[in-house]
Amino acid sequence: MYSSIKQIVVMNISGLIITYNEEKNIQAVLESFDFCNEIVVIDSFSTDKTVEIAKKFPNVKVVQNTFEDFTKQRNLALDSAKNDWVLFLDGDERLTPALKQEIIGELNKPGQKDAYYFYRKFFFAQKPIHCSGTQSDKNFRLFRKSKARYMAGKKVHETLEVNGTIGILKNKLLHYSVSDYESYRKKMIHYGVLKGKELAAKGKKYNVLVQYLKTAFK
């Protein structure tokens, strides 16, 4: 499977992922990168078997770096990749066969865009979510690193700034965002702490009234 798919890819591409204790996910994600001629794993000193599993795959480069925020880890991944084209996946994201073939098709075109949005299909506890705004969620996942950079100062919900042409892929990326309610709670606390640090760095203070109004009018 690895060699048969790789042979039809004209463009060299690096698969990128940032990790911390992703032993349950890392193998499936790296298998999604089977058409990439390089895989870069930026690991925040995992204490489980994440790195051990990653090193079993061919063409994998593991870089361990202390976690400060998501933006810095993602930009380090870009800097560590040898190819201009990169495909970024999170530990809880999976490519479908149709999306993989669409990616390969775009890379093989004579005139590609510089960055591509992926729509995502969300799952909660393995069950698909069809509403709550997630149906319109999209993120940049495939792009030329020479044309893009993650915006400095964003500690969570990092933003990719693209200086070039933009396309949108039709097939959706599967996003198994939450496995259970406890992991959801921990994720929200972690994101909340990072967002608080981001706002504090900008000199902003928490306002109960503003937060209430934001929630009420969503």
PLM segments and residue spans:
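Short, Lys/Arg-enriched N-terminal segments with co-localized hydrophobic residues
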Residues: 2-10
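Conserved donor nucleotide-binding strand/loop of the catalytic core
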Residues: 51-80
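Short, well-formed alpha-helical segments that are part of the catalytic scaffolds
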Residues: 16-35
